[in-house]
């Protein structure tokens, strides 16, 4: 949604390119996260991610133990900034969708969203069990509905692909100085959707129970690719299959819900609002999961810092519900850009280890 809002149809193509190229970086960073994971004394299980494998790499190069490594610290701070920004995006999307569907004032919906999120975060056992049951059902419903819409409009699909490729390389965008915006927004939103190279996903990959580090890498490479090329593409097609005169000038949830209203009537608007509301909590929990290992790296193993970040994330959730659509992306864009820079710096020299693990894994498979 954000890619098309800011960069038009051509941004979808660059999201695909990001997904294809990003699969290799996703494999390397997830494998490294498994190689350098460590026990988590607070939550149990394992933790890890770029802050940890960067730290290990510097210690190996300098051949001495370090309490903190500058690049690891910078990555962890950038990650926390990014995830605070994503918290704003979550609430902004939900609040906008409910305003469109039910005319609920943003302040009321923001308060409800933050209150429910606080219950889930601070006392989550029962609510998480409910989400575990409901969210997969909604995901299947969204998948089926979007596929049905695409099938119903199969005749228009070639025109959509033509528009995507034309605007990705079009002379019109280049002449208007818009090609850079198309490319930039496609890559930025591609990074948010597949996370490849940014260092977010390895925080989760480190916690996985794997007998071979490579397995986490392969799963991550496939997951990021499918997430962008299949899941995000379906949403893009829904918007691009709507008549241009109906969606011109719209952005964010206004764009998506107007497109859904064209395809499914009022039901489409309400369906998007309900789906986003449920998905927002699982996404928010995912963000906090990513954040906790970086908070631990920065401030040590203590509950005070963990709770403080959760409270900060709830505050950002509140701010995002009331802020302008373009504003809420800014903090996330800055954070993910810095994360990617610090992560890629280390992925290049460390990539050999991941590739070595892959070769050994392939040898075992051939036996």
Please give the residue ranges for each predicted region.
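Extracellular loop-to-transmembrane helix junctions
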Residues: 4-44, 226-234, 333-346
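Helix-loop-helix module between adjacent transmembrane segments
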Residues: 18-46, 55-92, 96-120, 274-285, ...
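Extracellular/periplasmic helix-exit of transmembrane alpha-helices
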Residues: 29-35, 41, 147-163, 177, ...
């Amino acid at each position: 949604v954000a890619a098309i809002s800011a960069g038009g149809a051509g941004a979808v193509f660059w999201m695909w390119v990001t997904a294809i190229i990003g699969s290799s970086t996703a494999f390397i960073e997830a494998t490294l996260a498994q190689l350098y994971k460590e026990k988590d004394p607070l939550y149990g299980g394992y933790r890890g991610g770029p802050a940890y494998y960067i730290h290990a790499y510097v210690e190996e190069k300098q051949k001495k133990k370090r309490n903190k490594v500058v690049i690891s610290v910078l990555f962890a701070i950038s990650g926390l900034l990014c995830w605070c920004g994503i918290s704003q995006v979550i609430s902004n999307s939900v609040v906008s969708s409910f305003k469109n569907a039910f005319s609920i004032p943003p302040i009321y919906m923001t308060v409800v969203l933050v209150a429910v999120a606080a219950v889930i975060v601070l006392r989550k056992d029962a609510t998480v069990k409910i989400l575990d049951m409901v969210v997969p059902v909604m995901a299947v419903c969204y998948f089926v509905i979007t596929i049905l819409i695409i099938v119903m409009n199969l005749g228009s699909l070639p025109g959509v692909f033509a528009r995507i490729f034309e605007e990705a390389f079009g002379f019109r965008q280049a002449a208007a100085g818009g090609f850079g915006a198309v490319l930039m927004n496609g890559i930025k939103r591609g990074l948010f959707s597949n996370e490849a190279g940014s260092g977010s996903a390895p925080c989760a990959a480190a916690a996985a129970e794997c007998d071979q580090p490579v397995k986490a890498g392969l799963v991550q490479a496939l997951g990021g690719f499918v997430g962008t090329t299949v899941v995000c593409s379906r949403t893009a097609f829904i918007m691009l299959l709507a008549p241009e005169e109906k969606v011109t000038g719209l952005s964010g949830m206004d764009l998506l819900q107007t497109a859904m209203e064209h395809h499914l009537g009022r039901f489409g608007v309400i369906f998007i609002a309900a789906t986003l509301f449920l998905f927002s909590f699982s996404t928010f929990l995912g963000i906090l999961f990513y954040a906790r290992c970086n908070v631990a790296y920065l401030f040590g193993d203590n509950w005070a810092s963990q709770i403080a970040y959760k409270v900060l994330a709830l505050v950002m959730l509140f701010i995002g519900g009331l802020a302008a659509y373009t504003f809420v992306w800014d903090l996330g864009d800055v954070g993910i850009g810095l994360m990617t820079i610090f992560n890629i710096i280390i992925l290049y020299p460390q990539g050999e280890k991941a590739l070595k693990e892959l070769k050994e894994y392939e040898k075992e498979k051939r036996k």
